[in-house]
Every structure is written in C-alpha cells, then in structure tokens.
Amino acid sequence: KIAIQDASPKNVDLEFRKSLFKLIAGDLRVSSHFRVEDEYLQSSYEGGPIENFLSDKKVDLILRFSATQDLNSASANVKLINARTGTTTSERSYVLNDKKRYPFLAHKIVSEANDQIGAPSIKWMEQSVLFARYTEAKKSEIVLSDYTLTYQKVMVTGGLNIFPKWGNEEQSAFYYTSYNGAEPT
C-alpha cells in the first residue's frame, strides 16, 4: 500500500497541488501495481517520525512531492520512502517548461516510482495521445493530449481533419487526412 503526501510550500496554489495529488493517485491505481491510500495527506518535505512511518495507515511506501510553479514552468521534488524503516529509497527532481502540461509531470513521477519498485513498465503513461475531435458538421480539429485527457492542446483546426497518426517514435511529427473540399489531402 502506498500513501501520497503533499509537501509543497503553502504559497503554491492549493488547486494545483490537489490536482497533482489526484493525478498521481489515479496513475498509481491505473498501473495496478499499487494499492493507494485515498486520503490527501500533507507533510513537510523532510518529514518527521509520524510522517515518515504512517503506522496508523498501514502503508509500505510513501510518495512525497513538493511542487512549485511560476508563470511558465512547473516542477516537483519527489521522495519515495520506505514506510517500515522511514528511510528515503529514492529522490528525484522534475521540471516542465510549460506548466499547462503538468499532468505529464504526474505521469513521469509515477512511471519512475513504478520502475523503482521493479514492477513492469508503465512508460506509456508518459506518451502523448493524438486524436480528432468533431466540432460541427464537416469540421474537426486534431488534439494533442495526455492519456487522461486532462491536458489538451488543439494542433490543427479548419476543415475536416481526421485519422491523425504519429510520424515518428519521438512524437515530434504527425500525419493526418484533411477534407477541405471534395478530395482528401
């Protein structure tokens, strides 16, 4: 069983912190490698005897994050703590240059925590999803998203744009079919 503790500074937007908590908890559940303590727990980043063991919650691991954001970026320091011994088993820092993409921060944190315990890979969570969304008759847009659809960015508008497909493994290019007249292009 794993507990998630928010150790973010109090001046960081509470809605952002709780949203990150929910994404991390959801990702841990989706992985099916963890039983997740549902309670939103807060702690200092260093923790103390109570926060580092959580004996009343009967957990084996604690994932503690301290998230910050500024005008453009979002970052998090993360510790994975063995709740039986109170020792930190791993500690990492993550930075995203576009804070709107913060769901990918949660996905990366969970993917690496999953790797730390030696469970089968869930790296697919870190990848982007590309899909077509109809907006009205003969109109659609191509949207880039995370797998939870929490983050969405419209990439192509105008006309009927369908069948998006990644053009490479790095997900830096994509193809799609566009019906802007009688013929597909």
Each language-model region and where it sits:
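C-terminal/domain-edge helix-coil "capping" segments
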Residues: 1, 85-89, 96-154
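Short beta-strand->alpha-helix linker/helix-N-cap micro-motif
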Residues: 1-52
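Soluble periplasmic/extracytoplasmic beta-strand elements of cell-envelope proteins
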Residues: 3-6, 23, 27, 35-37, ...
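Structured segments of extracytoplasmic/periplasmic soluble domains
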Residues: 23-34, 57, 108, 112-120
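Amphipathic beta-strand/beta-sheet edge segments enriched in Tyr/Trp
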Residues: 49-109
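Beta-strand C-termini and the immediately following turn/loop, strongest in propeller blades
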Residues: 66, 129-136, 168, 174-181
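Structural motif
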Residues: 71-77, 136-144, 182-185
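Conserved beta-propeller blade repeats
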Residues: 122, 159-177
